[in-house]
Amino acid sequence: MPKSKTRTPVEIAVVGEVDDWEEDVIKGLLEVPARGECAFYIDSAGGSVYGALAVVTLLRYRRLDAAAVVLGECSSAALMLFAACRRRFVTPYSTLLFHRMKWESEKRIASTEALNWAKHFGDLEKDVDDLQVRLFGGAAEQVREWTLLGRYVTGREIVAAGLAEMFEI
């Protein structure tokens, strides 16, 4: 009988703003065999929802079995990656900020383009909120309430909601 190889999950640091880690995380995910395992170590205040969506899309497209460990903070757009993982770990000291999307632009644009963007932004915000709830796979009303309130949530609260496991330090 052939010996089975035990695969060690590829470990990926997710530290800083989304724009700081998006490229490295995507490259790291491409190193993981399709249907392989990876572990994310997260300390991120969030950032670009598009960058977070790119990472989550690749994670799901390649059907990776992912775990996430919140080392410190996991907020805003970084929550999308956390929610997309099959196993999630927090400490009692973990902080997670749920909030609605924020629009920020320094571009000079015509009023018609601004109106089109405003409609797109409203649709995207609802779709992203729905996706995040679906990715968490539980406590939908709690996640929606935290998001609406712009709430900082502790590791203990995430565990109590059934969305993660506690890792004591």
Positions of PLM-derived features:
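Terminal-region recognition feature
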Residues: 1-169
